[in-house]
Curated annotation (Swiss-Prot):
Residues 778-790 have a biased composition (Basic residues). Keywords: Coiled coil, Inflammatory response, Nucleus, Wnt signaling pathway. One of its GO terms (cellular component) is nucleus. This is Protein strawberry notch homolog 1. Residues 694-713 have a biased composition (Basic and acidic residues). It comes from the Eukaryota. PANTHER family: PROTEIN STRAWBERRY NOTCH HOMOLOG 1, STRAWBERRY NOTCH-RELATED. GO terms for molecular function: chromatin DNA binding; histone binding. Plays a crucial role in the regulation of neural stem cells (NSCs) proliferation. Enhances the phosphorylation of GSK3B through the PI3K-Akt signaling pathway, thereby upregulating the Wnt/beta-catenin signaling pathway and promoting the proliferation of NSCs. It comes from Gallus gallus.
Amino acid sequence: MVEPGQDLLLAALSESGISPNDLFDIDSPDVVLATPTPAVQQSVPLSALDLGLETEAPAAVKQEPETVSTPALLNVRQPPSTTTFVLNQINQLPTLGTTIVMTKTTPVTTTRQTITVAKIIQTSTTTRPSVAAPAVRNALTTAPSKDQIQLKDLLKNNSLNELMKLKPPPNIAQPVATAATDLSNGAVKKEASTKEVARIWINDVKMRSFSPTMKVPAVKEEEEPEEEDEEEMGHAETYAEYMPIKLKIGLRHPDPVVETSSLSSVTPPDVWYQTSISEETIDNGWLSALQLEAITYAAQQHETFLPNGDRAGFLIGDGAGVGKGRTIAGIIYENYLLGRKRAVWFSVSNDLKYDAERDLRDIGAKNILVHSLNKFKYGKISSKHNGSVKKGVIFATYSSLIGESQSGGKYKTRLKQLLHWCGEDFDGVIVFDECHKAKNLCPVGSSKPTKTGLAVLELQNKLPKARVVYASATGASEPRNMAYMNRLGIWGEGTPFREFSDFIQAVERRGVGAMEIVAMDMKLRGMYIARQLSFSGVTFKIDEVLLSQEYVKMYNKSVKLWVSARERFQQAADLIDAEQRMKKSMWGQFWSAHQRFFKYLCIASKVKRVVQLAREEIKNGKCVVIGLQSTGEARTLEALEEGGGELNDFVSTAKGVFQSLIEKHFPAPDRKKLFSLLGIDLTAQSNNNSPRDSPCKENKIKKRKGEEVSREAKKARKTGGLAGSSSDESESESDASDNEESDNESSRFLSSGDDDDFNPFRDESSEDDEDDPWLIRKEHKKVKEKKKKKSIDPDSIQSALLASGLGSKRPSCFTSTVGTTTSSTNASANSNTNSSFVTSQDAVERAQQMKKELLDKLEKLAEDLPPNTLDELIDELGGPENVAEMTGRKGRVVSNDDGSISYESRSELDVPVEILNITEKQRFMDGDKNIAIISEAASSGISLQADRRAKNQRRRVHMTLELPWSADRAIQQFGRTHRSNQVTAPEYVFLISELAGEQRFASIVAKRLESLGALTHGDRRATETRDLSRFNFDNKYGRNALEIVMKSIVNLDSPMVSPPPDFPGDFFKDVRQGLIGVGLINVEDRSGILTLDKDYNNIGKFLNRILGMEVHQQNALFQYFSDTLNAVIQNAKKNGRYDMGILDLGSGDEKVRKADVKKFLTPGYSTSGHVELYTISVERGMSWDEATKIWAEQTGPDDGFYLSLQIRNNKKTAILVKEVNPKKKLFWYTDQILGNNSN
């Protein structure tokens, strides 16, 4: 649609010999071209033009019979606006015979006149030849004179210096241009920039567009600042202050609470449920208004049933610190008052039982008792030997849910105990607090669902009438982790998604936008609520740590060691002819250790900086919380065992990782260990010294040593160890949980290699106690059975050898020992025993030699490797007496007064081990210690904020030394210091080293936070304010950029950007060699041709593997990748295809028009609701009035209007270019249609 003020430019373009068809689609019914309506001013000398004036009716335009009307001269269909300008300021004067309609406005009347140009008089000192033309022709057919310079020709010649001759000459007064504009086309908002709105093209509305690939000659494209505008705008509009809309009871929450703008746009269902909670609780504010709202909607949802007959559940997605615990206590209290006196409450730690009791007590439910499940003996909970517990709350951890008694019996599992206590018709409350712990029910790749997830699902299926509540700030960082939330009714019988897999495919295929819709839909149905504390006052900062020269040298030495190790692993595996399955296991362990090793180096580089910052903050009157994920206790215990219980120095965790890998997983079989495991007496055979026996001696197959593994697992078990009960039963349950989780993680890692979800730093050490893949796994036999067994079944031996990859070529080597094979087998085997013996014996010795060489290299490097981060931090910050440690480990290495190093237990005489973390927390909150170090074990439920009720009210500075590997744990850690009822909001400091690979971990967290904010809070922008989104590479743009990078390095594609200019050497050659060293580029053995790894465009794998490259290489490669990614994103934005998620339309100068609305009824749940689909059109851009004002003020030689070279929708686009910096040739341009202001 054309603004009334467009007539000025159209007239000028027409006079210049340019057809308006170049600008507009004349056939469009929506485009009405305005007639130029100049009003003659007193300042115009009448002698300048010999004008013939004739009065005519306003509705008609007088034309010569033979004249073809120009589009610029079409009559206006509406009352024209008034435009005033000086005629002689048009540089290109009209040709003879041109007819111009003039409108002259007086206070009384408006008259229209037709001006026919009969004569041209030059008034300037420079004479200009007159142009004679008998009639006006269409601009498309008229051949202009030499003096008429056409804009089209100038642009075709790419000559910006030839200015479009529409600019006023410098010796003439500036033109005056006014035009009335109509802004009635829809609501126009002025709050935000137009750059947020995506292009929406509607078929019935023809809109003019600016070609995204248009290039202005001689204008160097700079990085466009509009990206920053978008981000700032997104931050400003991400949250809306929250107050319950449809529930008017309760007092205001003590702290400001917000909701994402996406969720706030959806209203929850009407409230019809009446709560039974006492007025005293409500009036005293023991439950705030928003907590009462959650209780009411949960109880209301519990009154409905899903199509499959199960009672509907409710999901509380409130952020950390809002008060989910008190809300859950309120739901239990509400049901208790209605006669449902039994409830089950699951959480992640037994420590949180005390918080549950506190929450119930605080809301006035003192008579509801809380019992720990792991304190009960196996058997009926209501029996006498369990205290005849028949009502109250049973508090259990997820690990105890899968606990099992070894003694047997009818109720030998905790799950059966619970099911019996509840009963088949149980309609009480089951709460899954911190329910992200039940994730991974839906397996990825070849992994298996976790036992925890299966148990949670079974409990819900066995109790269909139970009132289920899911509660977690991180309920589902990915939709795949929602598999256990089957009570939400999103999938299943009677819903659009028959199976959960159907739901997953639909959501994941559509990306983050679909997850936002899922959250909004759940709120609309009344099954979901998500609020979080306002982040006002919270500061976020990313502190990049510089690396010292000594550190870089140590790092590069480590890289060379790992490159050498990779070659040795490959050579040794080929020497012993290992099977493919065993190779896969070997490489899985190798790359897992590779990632852990360099992760520990990355963390170690930041210790000095953290200590420095911590000391500064303490001096400034603040207190410090340092977040870690791994404690490295397993390596400490291994070193302690090797040293006979004594230590000479702090243990190097990195060294322990590499040493454990070589000793347990290097493919160099130990034949003595093999035969001892198989029960074969080698000494009895040694006297024969027969060649046919020798091949068997080099075979090494492993089985699990039951006693040893059990002992090591108990030693190394850390997470949850301090949270468990002192009873034997709870200990065994905790062990079972750890083994179950870690076994699943291990299998998942082996199946997917470098999957981002794999946690290489989990506290359980069972991964390092995994069986050597070169040894078979064998069930534990009792000692008595071993003594009785005189012979070995040859089939079992052969299968064991086959499992190790050693039995296929030498199947008969055990014939003399076993004595049960046939004579024909003996004969066939003896025919080639000599050659087989020589080859295999030599291979094993060479493999053993390689193993020894690697261990020797490690010892040389070990002097430079950093010590355990946690021990070093505590030592540097003043020792255990000054630092409150809240981790899962049981002991630590300390520096004594005499300078010696020793290992000591964390337990204290007056503090039971099960409440050690709670005691340390209290010391921190009381101000006895001003520094706290928390690990994952303390990341759930523990409150460390500057609480008004605590003695220590210093401002918290939360330093994240080690970014959690998943968003679940990141949110939990961030929420420890930002909670309700705090005096001051915390400061967050994220320490990231300048190592390129280090940003890999920030990338994963950023990805998870983005997805997390989208799903659990309905808006992906909810997590952008955490200042980590700039490290998010794992998206479609990142994968596209990585594909371009990898292909350009192996010369399969041309580079999109130039390599870093400061790289010393041949960038592509050096980086190619580095990527070969980390396995991302393969070299064919025979041809030497370079091929890319099958997962070459996997962002996680790429950023993980480049950790193993030298510092300058990985930094340069990462810079090259980042530059390519920026180019990819810029192209996507210019093409209008950049995914910006849910956005607000009409927030700037856009004109939004509603074209159509369709309503759809939403099936799958009983509550009424519908979905509305709006079809709208959005028009954006600068008005012609604004454009002409800017045009009038131009002074630069290259300023003016330009046309795009490319045609889109059969139209060209005009842009206004203004010179900003003549020296740098920096220009400001405005796309008239899209309104993009760029430099």
